[in-house]
Amino acid sequence: MYDWLNALPKAELHLHLEGSLEPELLFALAERNKIALPWNDVETLRKAYAFNNLQEFLDLYYKGADVLRTSQDFYDLTWAYLLRCKEQNVIHTEPFFDPQTHTDRGIPFEVVLNGIAAALKDGEQQLGITSGLILSFLRHLSEAEAEKTLDQALPFRDAFVAVGLDSSEMGHPPSKFQRVFDRARHEGFLTVAHAGEEGPPEYIWEAIDLLKIQRIDHGVRAIEDERLMQRIIDEQIPLTVCPLSNTKLCVFDDMAQHNILDMLERGVKVTVNSDDPAYFGGYVTENFHALYTSLGMTQDQAKRLAQNSLDARLVKP
């Protein structure tokens, strides 16, 4: 079944480039940039990938991102991810990157973007993988800081298709970023947002009504609100669900409790994604395979999930 799932043409719509930084590449970049790491070797670092919640993961994620310093580093990071896409027949990807993670460390915005954009361009030309880049604001920072990031992005507007919202969800509702999202839409960007991962269904309502999103990233807690479920089904608002991430961060205690197939059967346009695959133990095919082994996902369900991902692209072929 793994090989069959791997061969299925699919799109990935919820992937943080910084979260695809495998320990081996992290150590190689640390050496290249002469950065001392708090871990002795790759295995010690991998053992640190045990999280009880979103915040514990984010603390490690930001520490790991510190090895990314030059455009070449960002190119290598993105290229390594694209090679995984090629292996798993991901024919289109819409990855996030978090500029504030890097600009707050003194890395110029264009250094980050140039490396990522060059790799995505090469990915299309050399690997046949199409893409659309999403600039994500960090929700634990202020809206004023998000505005500043949008200002930095505008000279490079052709490099992005959308803005998003990620990082620590609790206590940082989508409404906190309504003005900057209004402005981004006015500037011609599409919008997406993480909501309903650890946060309540109310955050999903806010993302839909205030941020006017095209897609909800995660959204698994929508099932707690029947009226919200009906709205998502009626309007066919896609959900970019990340099963391995959800179990690794204890959103669900184990995969057998995951609600993605329940949502699929109720008519929700759910998709399967890897989120931060280096940290959560699997890329897209591994996420599909986990649904097969733990939930008994059928081939028909897998085909529908893969088709949903292709249908929910912001960048249409």
From Swiss-Prot:
GO terms for molecular function: adenine deaminase activity; zinc ion binding. Zn(2+) binds at residues 14, 16, 194, 275. CDD domains: ADA. The record marks 218 as: Important for catalytic activity. The active site is at 197 (proton donor). Substrate binds at residue 276. It holds the Pfam family A_deaminase. Binds 1 zinc ion per subunit. Keywords: Hydrolase, Metal-binding, Nucleotide metabolism, Zinc. Its cofactor is Zn(2+). Its EC number is 3.5.4.2. GO terms for cellular component: cytosol. InterPro entries: A_deaminase_dom (IPR001365), ADE (IPR028892), Ado/ade_deaminase (IPR006330), Metal_Hydrolase (IPR032466). It catalyses: adenine + H2O + H(+) = hypoxanthine + NH4(+). One of its GO terms (biological process) is nucleotide metabolic process. Catalyzes the hydrolytic deamination of adenine to hypoxanthine. Plays an important role in the purine salvage pathway and in nitrogen catabolism. Belongs to the metallo-dependent hydrolases superfamily. Adenosine and AMP deaminases family. Adenine deaminase type 2 subfamily. This is Adenine deaminase. It comes from Pseudomonas fluorescens (strain SBW25). The lineage of its organism: Bacteria, Pseudomonadati, Pseudomonadota, Gammaproteobacteria, Pseudomonadales.
